[in-house]
Amino acid sequence: MLTFVGLGLYDERSITVAGREALRSADRVFAEFYTSKLAGATVEELQNHHDIDIEVRDRAGVEQEPGPILDAAEAGGAVFLTAGDTMISTTHVDLRLRADNRGIETQIIHGTTAGAAAASLSGLQNYRFGKATTLPFPYAHGGEGVPGSVLDTIADNRKRGLHTLVYLDIKVGTGPRGPDPDHEEYMTADYAAELLAEDLDTVGVAIARAGSPDPVLAADRLSALADRSFGDPLHLLIVPGDLHVVEHDALVALAGAPESALPDPV
């Protein structure tokens, strides 16, 4: 059996009860933290809290050499961990399909996702979100500024009055000069706002440390958000589309948005 367990958003306590039980009953536990991480807990803290040993795999060890994970699942009970949910944004469908091809039973125990938290914290209605996008570091896409695909996604959503959730780049094990096992870099909301404001100085919503006891939420024009600091990672950015009156009021009351920066509600 291979059980995919989402750890949730912040620390060792963010996992569901079902996820915790799966961890403690597993013969072996694997994890990856190159697509996301728990900002409030180290691997050691996870191990100590749940009384388990965790075998952390890098990208190659999951996507190119998954044999040890699959062998463990074939021999007994194996758990594969990620931050958030293992199949949302941080997707590991390929690993699940490889297990299925070997006749290994699989199970998913879901975790809270950044997308769900972004809608909950901001007061923006989740069914008014369009396609999400990821903003990479300029060096990661070999160009300058914001890739056209990111701007196109935001523009297409806005034409339909929809909000855009912008995931911010994470680079673990790879830096500006290529592979680097010591490199760990997380794009901040202020830097993302600065990049986007060069092409689209509209309203943005910055979210930092969703799922923590002290998340930060701020809404303003992107150029104004670029001048602020939002503290430790992980960060997200939302570019709103048309605003319902309740969404408008939520951004003012909950995110401190200046009314002058917001479009009139529809």
Curated annotation (Swiss-Prot):
Highest taxon of the lineage: Archaea
Alphabetized SUPFAM superfamilies for the sequence: Tetrapyrrole methylase
Chain sites annotated for binding S-adenosyl-L-methionine: L9, D85, I88, T113, A114, L168, A210, H235
Reaction(s) catalysed (UniProt annotation): 2-[(3S)-amino-3-carboxypropyl]-L-histidyl-[translation elongation factor 2] + 3 S-adenosyl-L-methionine = diphthine-[translation elongation factor 2] + 3 S-adenosyl-L-homocysteine + 3 H(+)
InterPro entries: 4pyrrol_Mease, 4pyrrol_Methylase_sf, 4pyrrole_Mease_sub1, 4pyrrole_Mease_sub2, Dphthn_synthase
Alphabetical UniProt keywords: Methyltransferase, S-adenosyl-L-methionine, Transferase
GO molecular function, one term: diphthine synthase activity
Matching NCBIfam families: dph5
Subunit structure: Homodimer.
Protein name: Diphthine synthase
Gene this chain is encoded by: dphB
